[in-house]
């Protein structure tokens, strides 16, 4: 045998490696599972849980200032005025004339062909666009306290008169449209409602009862533990009439109140809060999409369906007008239903939720791995196994289910607090720049007038977005240590 220094044996090497491996990451988890070696087998070591050895970084929240937000009634009034302006410009695009020519050339001496306009259709569209404003007026009047019988009686009479007037105009215009137009044209009048009922009424995001405003903190503990395996315990089947009633009530109700956030410490409560906020956010987005498409449909598309076959209009410009109306209506409704305070609430919940990154098989084979536990708060960088896959903790505070795609999507959207605001700002800024470019290249008087009127409305929306972006950007960039906040 040649001489020389002999290294340690394989048994001695494995024995010396185990304590360092356990001390590095923390041994077994709180649910009785331990580390795993390269072959995937568990190493039975008695060690304290991982949260006792590696404390997750505490979650700190920024305090944002209270930014002014338009009230429900003020917003509905401004939104209704904007829709009326866009409806007026669409009628200009369709029924414009060359009124500056001498009288011996054209047969028209006015700027529009008023004799071709269907006033019953215009009144019908106006009533449909005013539905949210009328309901906001009634809701606002109902919330006002009345101390005398006379004021209360006047309030009831005013509500009845307003509803009767709107109902009479709606019925009168509908009857006249039935008399003067074909059945095919009349199908376009209620097309949005016909599409809304099957798409939205039967898809309620697995929820049957409205969740409390504090996102599940009033839910009993038994239901919280059942919700860890799925929120099916809170779901009860509904019939068609109940779904239809609830969906129509959502369309007419004022914007819902913003839920609260109390920085829960239990992983079950955090996941329950995320499920609640996810359902609330989906409902708000559904309302934004439907109302923006509804407004663009009745403002820019429905007048085109009732144009006579002998009437010429610029199809490309009318379609472009339709797209611009829809985009701006989408941004206006998003800024109202997704205010900065609500986006900050989603960001705080995402900070507590965390995220897991799925790794390929065979990677990090020498690193310690744990079995994921639903009752453990996992720090950043920890490797866990769940559903035969390997995941790495991305956030500083992780309680999300690794295989749950909705949790990863929620964290991606809201872990940066300005992501939604930046997206809306880019959309509105691009729209304004395109309208300015179109205004510079416009050669027809109706194009210039329509773009100028719509730009006047878009400037207000762009100003609000820029103001919120500048203020919130400064607030979120401020060091957290200067607030003197306690970690949650």
Curated annotation (Swiss-Prot):
SS bond partners: none
Residue ranges crossing the lipid bilayer per the database entry: 72-92, 110-130, 155-175, 182-202, 287-307, 319-339, 420-440, 446-466
GO BP term (any one): negative regulation of autophagosome maturation
Entry's localization field: Membrane
Membrane-related topology note: Multi-pass membrane protein
Pfam families according to UniProt: Tmp39 (PF10271)
InterPro entries on file: Uncharacterised_TMEM39
A GO cellular component annotation in the UniProt record: endoplasmic reticulum membrane
Keyword annotations of the record: Glycoprotein, Membrane, Transmembrane, Transmembrane helix
Glycosylation-annotated residues: 31, 39, 180, 206
Family stated for the protein in its record: Belongs to the TMEM39 family.
Name of the protein described by the UniProt record: Transmembrane protein 39A-B
Provenance organism: Xenopus laevis (African clawed frog)
């Amino acid at each position: 045998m040649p001489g020389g220094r002999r290294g340690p044996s394989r048994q001695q090497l494995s024995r010396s490696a185990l304590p360092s491996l356990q001390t590095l990451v923390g041994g077994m988890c709180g649910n009785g599972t331990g580390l795993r070696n390269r072959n995937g087998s568990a190493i039975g070591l008695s060690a304290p849980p991982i949260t006792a050895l590696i404390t997750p970084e505490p979650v700190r929240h920024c305090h944002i200032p209270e930014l002014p937000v338009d009230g429900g009634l003020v917003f509905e009034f401004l939104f209704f005025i904007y829709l009326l302006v866009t409806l007026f410009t669409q009628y200009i695009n369709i029924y414009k004339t060359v009124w500056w020519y001498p009288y011996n050339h054209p047969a028209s001496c006015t700027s529009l062909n008023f004799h071709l306009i269907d006033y019953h259709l215009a009144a019908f569209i106006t009533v449909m666009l005013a539905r949210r404003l009328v309901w906001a007026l009634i809701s606002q009047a109902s919330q006002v306290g009345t101390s005398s019988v006379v004021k209360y009686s006047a309030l009831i009479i005013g509500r009845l008169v307003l509803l009767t007037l709107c109902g009479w105009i709606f019925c009168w215009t509908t009857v006249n449209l039935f008399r003067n137009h074909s059945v095919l044209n009349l199908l376009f009048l209620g097309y949005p409602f016909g599409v809304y009922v099957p798409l939205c009424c039967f898809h309620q995001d697995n929820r049957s009862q409205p969740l409390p405003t504090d996102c599940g903190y009033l839910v009993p503990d038994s239901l919280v533990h059942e919700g860890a395996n799925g929120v099916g315990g809170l779901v009860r089947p509904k019939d068609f009439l109940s779904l239809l009633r609830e969906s129509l009530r959502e369309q007419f109700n004022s914007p819902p109140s913003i839920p609260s956030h109390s920085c829960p410490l239990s992983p079950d409560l955090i996941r329950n809060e995320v499920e609640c906020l996810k359902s609330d956010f989906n409902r708000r987005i559904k309302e934004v999409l439907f109302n923006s498409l509804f407004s663009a449909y009745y403002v820019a598309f429905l007048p085109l369906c009732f144009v006579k076959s002998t009437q010429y209009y610029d199809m490309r410009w009318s379609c472009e007008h339709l797209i611009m109306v829809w985009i701006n209506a989408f941004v206006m409704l998003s800024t109202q239903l997704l205010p900065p305070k609500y986006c900050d609430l989603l960001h705080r919940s995402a900070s507590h939720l965390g995220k897991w990154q799925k790794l390929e098989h065979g990677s990090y084979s020498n690193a310690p791995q744990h079995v994921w536990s639903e009752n453990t708060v996992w720090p950043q960088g920890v490797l866990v196994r769940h559903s035969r896959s390997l995941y790495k903790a991305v956030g500083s505070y992780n309680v999300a289910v690794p295989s749950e795609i909705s949790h990863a999507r929620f964290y991606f959207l809201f872990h940066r607090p300005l992501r939604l605001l930046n997206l809306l700002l880019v959309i509105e800024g691009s729209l304004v720049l395109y309208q300015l470019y179109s205004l510079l290249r416009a050669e027809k008087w109706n194009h210039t007038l329509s773009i100028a009127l719509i730009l006047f409305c878009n400037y207000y929306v762009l100003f609000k977005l820029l103001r919120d972006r500048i203020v919130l950007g400064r607030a979120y960039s401020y060091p957290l240590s200067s607030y003197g906040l306690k970690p949650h």
